[in-house]
Curated annotation (Swiss-Prot):
PANTHER family (alphabetical): BIS(5'-NUCLEOSYL)-TETRAPHOSPHATASE PRPE [ASYMMETRICAL], METALLOPHOSPHOESTERASE
Organism: Bacillus cereus (strain Q1)
Function: Asymmetrically hydrolyzes Ap4p to yield AMP and ATP.
Cofactor requirements of the protein: Ni(2+)
Gene from which this protein is expressed: prpE
Record-linked SUPFAM superfamilies: Metallo-dependent phosphatases
UniProt catalytic activity: P(1),P(4)-bis(5'-guanosyl) tetraphosphate + H2O = GMP + GTP + 2 H(+)
Keywords annotated in UniProt: GTP-binding, Hydrolase, Nickel, Nucleotide-binding
One Pfam family in the UniProt entry: Metallophos
Name the UniProt record assigns to this protein: Bis(5'-nucleosyl)-tetraphosphatase PrpE [asymmetrical]
GO CC terms of this entry: cytoplasm
Length: 246
């Protein structure tokens, strides 16, 4: 099986459509379907900050749950939106407010449909995907070699948030260790979460979050070819979001 792994979309539907077309997908049925049966895999954070979060929920639900032709691993923004839809007390900030505004503008029957689709998508998707006979791991923020195969709370925190130290940057965002430098495994770990200006290859890991929602690019990784394909963002560039990893 061949995969096209897509970085953090954050509601950037136009960039997602542009990227999938560049990757050879047809949109004849309003969904990206590849003529050679390649499958899309999403590293999470499909919503928040960008203009079309609900459209992305509907597309990813259709591909993953209904047609079963794609893979999705949830990100930290996905986790927060899931908790919002469950009625938990979450702070509506850091991008969630854009998704909530879209959601609240809908009639109640459409709200219920979006809520049900996202809850189903989240609950039926694993924390990370182990593909190609364990040669490929797709997850949101990365995973340590000794965590592969585990699903406990410590692993959940790692794959959603990265290797956080407990400290904070001046803007309140968490300080993260550079776990990829310590990775010694042979499985390819393809992830996102931390915006980088260019895809970052370290050992057998690749960070493909190139900050589409911050004016960078939306990036896909063609596997097993290990070929990078990107499209430019239509949004303003926000340089402070591309912080070096500690």
């Amino acid at each position: 099986m061949k995969y096209d792994i897509i970085g953090d979309i954050h509601g950037c539907f136009q960039e997602f459509q542009d990227l999938t077309k560049k990757l050879g997908y047809n949109w004849n049925s309003d969904l990206p379907i590849h003529p050679d049966q390649r499958k899309l895999a999403f590293v999470g954070d499909i919503t928040d900050r960008g203009p079309h979060s609900l459209r992305m929920i509907e597309i990813v639900w259709e591909l993953v749950i209904n047609k079963k032709v794609a893979y999705y691993a949830p990100g930290n923004h996905c986790n927060k939106l899931y908790r919002f839809f469950l009625g938990r007390n979450v702070t509506i900030a850091h991008g969630l407010e854009t998704t909530v505004a879209e959601y609240e503008a809908l009639p109640s029957h459409q709200q219920n449909m979006i809520k049900e689709k996202f809850i189903t998508l989240y609950e039926q998707s694993p924390l990370y995907h182990v593909l190609d006979e364990k040669r490929l791991i797709v997850c949101h923020a990365g995973i340590r070699q000794d965590y592969i195969g585990r699903k406990d709370k410590k692993v959940q925190t790692f794959v959603l948030y990265g290797d956080i130290t407990g400290e904070k940057h001046a803007d309140g965002s968490p300080v993260r260790r550079d776990w990829a430098k310590e990775y010694k495994g042979t499985s390819w770990i393809v992830y996102g979460h931390t915006p980088v200006k260019e895809p970052r290859f370290v050992n057998h890991t690749v960070n493909i979050d190139t900050g589409a929602v911050f004016g960078g690019k939306l990036t896909g990784l063609r596997y097993p070819e290990m070929e990078i394909v990107s499209v430019p963002s239509s949004l303003p560039f926000v340089p402070e979001k591309f912080r070096p990893i500690s």
